[in-house]
From Swiss-Prot:
PROSITE patterns: HEXAPEP_TRANSFERASES (PS00101). It is found in: Cytoplasm. Its EC number is 2.7.7.23, 2.3.1.157. Pathway: Nucleotide-sugar biosynthesis; UDP-N-acetyl-alpha-D-glucosamine biosynthesis; N-acetyl-alpha-D-glucosamine 1-phosphate from alpha-D-glucosamine 6-phosphate (route II): step 2/2; Nucleotide-sugar biosynthesis; UDP-N-acetyl-alpha-D-glucosamine biosynthesis; UDP-N-acetyl-alpha-D-glucosamine from N-acetyl-alpha-D-glucosamine 1-phosphate: step 1/1; Bacterial outer membrane biogenesis; LPS lipid A biosynthesis. This is Bifunctional protein GlmU. Its cofactor is Mg(2+). Its main location: cytoplasm. Residues 1-229 are annotated as: Pyrophosphorylase. It catalyses: alpha-D-glucosamine 1-phosphate + acetyl-CoA = N-acetyl-alpha-D-glucosamine 1-phosphate + CoA + H(+); N-acetyl-alpha-D-glucosamine 1-phosphate + UTP + H(+) = UDP-N-acetyl-alpha-D-glucosamine + diphosphate. Binds 1 Mg(2+) ion per subunit. Residues 230-250 are annotated as: Linker. Disulfide bonds: none annotated. In the N-terminal section; belongs to the N-acetylglucosamine-1-phosphate uridyltransferase family. In the C-terminal section; belongs to the transferase hexapeptide repeat family.
């Protein structure tokens, strides 16, 4: 069916006392992203013309964290219930648009479920998302007559008979803007909590003869809210299990789906293999036949075809061309770039550095602010000394250079094509093509030397 224009209200004013945190509840993260951001993203994908965020506690921190100038920030200075929160947003509703109500602490709600709810909304009525629970204790119950929804009664206000009802309110609903404003104006706080319940509009709509269409989500977990860290951790595992399942069904080999975390967006080629305890953050692309070893963290990086990242390596804001090998225990920091066939071994760190085709840095090396050509060998213990205490400087190493172990390159410095740097050398001046450079303290031999004896 053809949908009306729609705006979304996200309720995010609660303090989250049971989180025992100074951070507003909705800013606690799920899959590396604030809970409320998941909800904002769903609203955006659904095509919301405007997203109204009702906030209260920690408003400044919310604004600083979300940094979204498209949001309409609506202050709820006193938290007097969900109906009161919607009343604060009501002046921004257009009469001819639909208003979808969501919650900042219900992060797993899917676009597909919301679209079905939107499609099911009757003309002049309400679309209401409900679920059936084996144990509905604590939730508002859906009351019906002859199968039709007539209202919602909160648990504290329910009779013993009503508490036997298993269908409960999720709090998510959609209604026309003009209708919603009229119903909101009629709300009272005559209940056990002394609050203004948005749920009371269901009875008001029924009294006007309006239809209330109940829709169920694809999964009950979509409507699970978060009140404490235990609930958040459970939703995290549900989310991660869903992401792992999608990857497995798309052809990615996860060696242990229960020990894989996706905290962003992952694009994979064919025959990708990911071992246990791998974390993917931000936007990551893995080419064909990429292998990621156990315990690796990959963040905002592009990994080319046939690359292999050995266990316990960290790759952040890096770009690897085809057939590169990394680790184990390697660290690629922002700006690291490896051309085809390059190798970075154990305990090697790169930052703002390019390693050319077929070049190798096998062990115990720091390469920072460096441009390294093709077919270069970087010996163990090599350091680019890029910082003088105030400024950073660049090291340039041309093609076919051999750098011996325990070399220090004091930037700014350039090493010419085909040069050889002997082990233990400190390079402080530019090196010409094909030169041999060495700087060593003369070796001293003392015959018959005796080690000191400890005094008694």
């Amino acid at each position: 069916m053809l949908n009306s224009a729609m705006s979304v209200v996200i309720l995010a004013a609660g303090k989250g006392t049971r989180m025992y945190s100074d951070i507003p509840k909705v800013l606690h993260t799920l899959a590396g992203k604030p809970m409320v951001q998941h909800v904002i993203d769903a609203a955006t994908k659904l095509g919301a013309a405007q997203v109204h965020l009702v906030y209260g506690h920690g408003g400044e921190l919310l604004k600083q964290t979300l940094k979204d100038d498209k949001l309409n920030w609506v202050l709820q200075a006193e938290q007097l219930g969900t109906g009161h929160a919607m009343q604060q947003a009501a002046p921004f509703f257009s009469d001819d648009e639909d208003i979808l109500m969501l919650y900042g602490d219900v992060p797993l709600i899917s676009v597909e479920t919301l679209q079905r709810l939107r499609d099911a909304k009757p003309q002049g009525g309400i679309g209401l998302l409900t679920v059936k629970l084996d144990d509905p204790s604590g939730y508002g119950r859906i009351t019906r007559e002859n199968g039709k929804v007539t209202g919602i009664v909160e648990h504290k206000d329910a009779t013993d008979e009503q508490r036997q009802i298993q269908e409960i309110n999720t709090g998510i609903l959609i209604a026309n803007g003009a209708d919603l404003k009229r119903w909101l104006s009629k709300l009272t706080n005559n209940n056990a909590q002394g609050e203004y319940y948005i749920t009371d509009i269901i009875a008001l709509a029924y009294q006007e003869g309006r239809e209330i269409a109940a829709v169920h989500p694809a999964r009950i977990s979509e409507t699970d809210g978060v009140n404490n860290r235990l609930q958040l951790s459970r939703l995290e595992r549900i989310y991660q299990a869903e992401q792992a399942e999608k990857l497995l069904l798309s052809g990615v080999m996860l060696r242990d789906p229960a020990r894989f975390d996706l905290r962003g967006t992952l694009h994979c080629g064919m025959d990708v293999e990911i071992d246990a305890n791998v974390i993917i953050e931000g936007y990551v692309t893995l080419g064909h036949r990429v292998k990621i070893g156990a315990g690796c963290i990959i963040k905002n990086s592009v990994i080319g075809d046939d690359c292999e990242i050995s266990p316990y390596s960290v790759v952040e804001d890096a770009h690897l061309e085809a057939a590169c090998t990394i680790g184990p225990f390697a660290r690629l920091r922002p700006g690291a770039e490896l051309l085809a066939g390059a190798h970075v071994g154990n305990f090697v760190e790169m930052k703002k550095a390019r390693l050319g085709k077929g070049s190798k840095a096998g062990h115990l090396t720091y390469l920072g602010d460096a441009e390294i050509g093709d077919n270069v060998n970087i010996g163990a213990g090599t350091i680019t000394c890029n910082y003088d205490g105030a400024n950073k400087f660049k090291t340039v190493i041309d093609d076919d250079v051999f750098v011996g172990s325990d070399t220090q390159l004091v930037a700014p410095v350039t090493v010419g094509k085909g040069a050889t740097i002997a082990a233990g050398t400190t390079v402080t001046r530019n090196v010409a093509d094909n030169e041999l450079v060495l700087s060593r303290v003369p070796q001293v031999h003392k015959q018959g030397w005796q080690r000191p004896v400890k005094k008694k």
